[in-house]
Amino acid sequence: MAAGCSEAPRPAAASDGSLVGQAGVLPCLELPTYAAACALVNSRYSCLVAGPHQRHIALSPRYLNRKRTGIREQLDAELLRYSESLLGVPIAYDNIKVVGELGDIYDDQGHIHLNIEADFVIFCPEPGQKLMGIVNKVSSSHIGCLVHGCFNASIPKPEQLSAEQWQTMEINMGDELEFEVFRLDSDAAGVFCIRGKLNITSLQFKRSEVSEEVTENGTEEAAKKPKKKKKKKDPETYEVDSGTTKLADDADDTPMEESALQNTNNANGIWEEEPKKKKKKKKHQEVQDQDPVFQGSDSSGYQSDHKKKKKKRKHSEEAEFTPPLKCSPKRKGKSNFL
């Protein structure tokens, strides 16, 4: 293990990752610092664990005067690679301590064996757990995500979705995507890779929420419009109807009052300035006192003005003819008396 650890290649730095990203094979990988990695531990679906661990290191004789540098080189070479002793993938470390005062040399091996202790942040996902990634690639066959800025995750197109449905999904570059861990792989160089799986139900739920919001907004607008119209129309129709009824009542009352005034004025020959109701009452009383027999009414009980005029004319004619009848017997009486 000591020889393997010493000869293991160093992980790609940020500059190397940019070259790989330009080729289109892998996105740009950036190793987080220990402080940044500790900040990600408490995030949702991080699958990160922080804690102290001990490691066995075979240090080359050239690092006898630079032990810390040699230890860091070996630990850096193991970052982003699965470690059986750590049961995960280390992404950052700090606070290195050498356990014991002296190292050990076994037989004729030239390396010095040391035990160290350091604080590690380990990425240890398991199949079935959920992760959050940033979308950095969208194609017709899969979606590429970057988890914690350093792990590449590939999410293939689900078999249940057709090509049209896959293209119409609202997933863009830079979006945060939630997925489920399906399988954990590593390439020939030992770089850790994640195979993910989309949750179709969550995607359909998002679509249904959007459609429900659209339908609810449409129904609310459709429900509000007729209500406003009804509120506007009802008072208008009511006001118009009430206005017409009032006008009709006034129109019916005015000709009756005018005709009654004209009849009373023609009969008496005098224009009076008394209220209209009093004139009507006086007319009815005079007609009833003078000639109650000739009062006519319609089937509805309403007394017509035309009949009143006829009655008054007959009454006036009788009044004109009555004086000569009264005078003639007086003259005859006088002649007979003589």
From Swiss-Prot:
One of the record's GO cellular component terms: nucleoplasm
Region (Disordered) residue spans: 209-338
Signal sequence, renumbered to the chain: none
InterPro entries: RNA_pol_Rpb7-like_N_sf, RNAP_I_Rpa43_N, RPA43_OB, Rpb7-like, Rpb7-like_N
Bias (Basic residues) ranges: 328-338
Tissue: Widely expressed. Expressed in all fetal and adult tissues tested, with highest expression in fetal lung, liver, and kidney, and low expression in all adult tissues.
GO annotation terms (biological process): cellular response to leukemia inhibitory factor; DNA-templated transcription initiation; transcription elongation by RNA polymerase I
Protein name: DNA-directed RNA polymerase I subunit RPA43
Organism: Homo sapiens (Human)
GN (gene name): POLR1F
